[in-house]
Swiss-Prot record:
Pathway: Pyrimidine metabolism; UMP biosynthesis via de novo pathway; orotate from (S)-dihydroorotate (quinone route): step 1/1
EC number: 1.3.5.2
The reaction(s) this protein catalyses: (S)-dihydroorotate + a quinone = orotate + a quinol
Residue numbers binding FMN: 61-65, 85, 139, 172, 217, 245, 268, 297, 318-319
Protein name, UniProt field: Dihydroorotate dehydrogenase (quinone)
Assembly and oligomerization: Monomer.
Protein encoded by which gene: pyrD
Length: 351
């Protein structure tokens, strides 16, 4: 069915199509017609971060920034859904247009800029969700006008409010669309920020009697030296996991496209190779006990298997969902299942 709707959606402005697509998913969920869009997925339990995921394929942050579509998204068969990025205060993000499709490359460029309704609105939306069929991740960030020296205050403000509701929390320090944000990945800044967040995480765990895993999401544009430094810091501070990766600022693989020079982060097929390379390097440098989520360029089951082979315990997609539709979810799960059941065909770590 998505193949029929896609030409219409792609004829619209990308951000308008985004909103209409989510509204259509909500309608399908309310009317019980989601099975027309997405195949039923047999369980494939995967225990990671001490949590049991119904299957290892999730939705990356960015599609549902405010947690308004949680039930409808879980109905597509995702083993986990990550909402956000959310900030302490509402913000409009960057001026439109700010979202661009590059169909010839199965790619998207976005410069959204953490547009969201604020953490309090997200909390209300999560509390209204009634059918969480998998694990819910909440991705947190800082407001655009908060200087990096005070970034920890923003992350802690979000952490405090979403902690009771999240199954895991992602610290987003890698979006290219908030000026200066990626500087928080530099070794000294990273250590200062994550140490404060780890301290608050332990305090919240004691308060609520429940330890919610905290992950850090990194960029695909890190040098080998940066990867080494990040792995050293995150390993020493014992974060629960790492998500590799966010979008890239390198548009060389879409050179020649009419939209290639639009500012923003590039996602989709062109980022697969580099994001998987960063994933593999992190896996080699981080403690074996620290799981990784692989995201970036997954447009097929084979791409998902490649992420697992590179060291991911779980995978996420977003751009692939735009180009392939909901059938991508079941395709990825089944590809991972086949490889898991036939380990002699390739090295995918046990889930």
């Amino acid at each position: 069915m998505y193949s029929l709707a896609r030409p219409f959606l792609f004829s619209l402005d990308a951000e308008r199509a985004h909103g209409l697509g989510l509204s259509a998913l909500d309608l399908a969920y309310r009317t019980g017609t989601t099975p027309l869009l997405a195949a039923r997925i047999a369980p494939m339990p995967s225990t990671v971060f001490g949590l049991t995921f119904p299957n290892p394929v999730g939705l990356a942050a960015g599609l549902d920034k405010n947690g308004e579509h949680i039930d409808a998204l879980f109905a597509l068969g995702f083993g986990f859904v990550e909402i956000g990025t959310i900030t302490p205060r509402p913000q409009a993000g960057n001026p439109q247009p700010r979202l661009f499709r590059l169909p010839a490359h199965n790619a998207i460029i976005n410069r959204m800029g953490f547009n969201n309704a604020g953490v309090d609105a997200l909390v209300r939306n999560v509390e209204r969700a009634r059918n969480r069929r998998g694990m819910l991740g909440i991705n947190i960030g800082k407001n655009k006008d908060t200087p990096n020296e005070q970034a920890a205050d923003d992350y802690i403000a979000c952490l405090d409010k979403v902690y009771p509701l999240a199954d895991y929390i992602t610290v987003n320090i890698s979006s290219p669309n908030t000026a200066g944000l990626r500087e928080l990945q530099e070794e000294t800044s990273l250590r200062q920020l994550v140490s404060q967040l780890r301290e608050r995480q332990e305090s919240l765990a004691a308060r609520y009697g429940r330890r919610v895993p905290m992950l850090v999401k990194v960029a695909p544009d890190l040098s080998e030296r940066d990867i080494d430094a990040a792995a050293r810091v995150l390993g020493e501070l014992q974060v629960d996991g790492v998500i590799a990766t966010n979008t890239t600022i390198d548009h060389s693989k879409v050179a020649g496209d009419p939209l290639a020079n639009e500012a923003g982060g590039l996602s989709g097929a062109p980022v697969l190779e580099q994001s998987t390379l960063v994933l593999r390097r992190l896996r080699a440098r981080l403690p074996e006990s620290m799981p990784l989520i692989g995201v970036g360029g997954i447009l097929s089951g084979a791409d998902a298997v490649a992420k697992m082979a590179a060291g991911a315990a779980l995978v996420q997609c977003y751009s692939g969902l735009i180009f392939r539709g909901p059938s991508l979810v079941s395709e990825c799960v089944e590809a991972i299942r086949r490889r898991r059941e036939a380990p002699s065909r390739g090295a995918v770590a046990p889930l």
